[in-house]
């Protein structure tokens, strides 16, 4: 979902030369759909400079707070936000999947699988919130969390057998051959 302050909407519509747009994004979006979006935008507006900041959707330094505080002009996030100072557009939908290393096998017992340590982005990550809700729904108490702000670090630790992770399916296509994906 794309969220933008009212001032930034006007600036993007005007496409002022020499303008700089500060984009906040989830790292999972940064590696999946953002490159294509930015390529199309840059082709149409080559004089506009783009800066990218990664972060979680929610929390004290989350992307929603950054847009409201005007430190980000717009943000690509997951989840829904209702706020009178934010305009939003749904730009796509994705499935959330659980990833684990290849040693897990073909058949999955989710109660057993979710007893593993979760590898996740810091608090405020929508996938982590959904993972915790799912674990609670099936009666599993979440174990220890290994947090990282790097998607590559999380995936590398999943491959090494340190635990499981929960991500949008679109962000893992590059890694798909390295471990099973369950949806």
PLM regions: where:
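Beta-alpha-beta core module
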Residues: 83-94, 153-183
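Central regulatory/effector-binding core of bacterial HTH transcription factors
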Residues: 18-83
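Short, well-ordered beta-strand segments
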Residues: 22-25, 75, 99, 119, ...
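Alpha-helical "hinge/linker" immediately C-terminal to small N-terminal DNA-binding modules
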Residues: 1-14
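Flexible hinge/capping segments at coil-to-helix
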Residues: 83-123
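Short beta-strand and adjacent tight-turn residues that come in two discontinuous sequence segments
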Residues: 72-78, 147-149, 166-168, 172
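Secondary-structure junction motif
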Residues: 117-138
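Hydrophobic residues within well-ordered alpha-helices
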Residues: 64-68, 113, 156-162
């Amino acid at each position: 979902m794309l969220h933008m302050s009212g001032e930034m909407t006007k600036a993007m519509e005007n496409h002022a030369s020499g303008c700089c747009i500060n984009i906040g994004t989830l790292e999972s979006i940064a590696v999946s759909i953002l490159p294509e979006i930015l390529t199309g935008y840059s082709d149409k507006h080559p004089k506009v400079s783009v800066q990218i900041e990664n972060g979680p959707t929610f929390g004290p330094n989350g992307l929603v707070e950054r847009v409201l505080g005007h430190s980000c002009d717009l943000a690509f996030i997951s989840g829904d936000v209702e706020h009178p100072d934010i305009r939003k557009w749904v730009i796509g939908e994705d499935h959330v999947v659980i990833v684990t290393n290849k040693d897990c096998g073909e058949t999955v017992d989710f109660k057993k699988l979710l007893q593993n340590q979760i590898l996740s982005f810091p608090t405020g990550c929508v996938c982590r919130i959904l993972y915790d809700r799912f674990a609670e729904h099936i009666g599993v108490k979440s174990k220890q969390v290994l947090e990282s702000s790097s998607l590559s670090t999380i995936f590398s630790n999943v491959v090494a057998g340190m635990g499981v992770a929960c991500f949008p399916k679109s962000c893992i296509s590059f890694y798909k051959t390295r471990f099973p994906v369950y949806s």
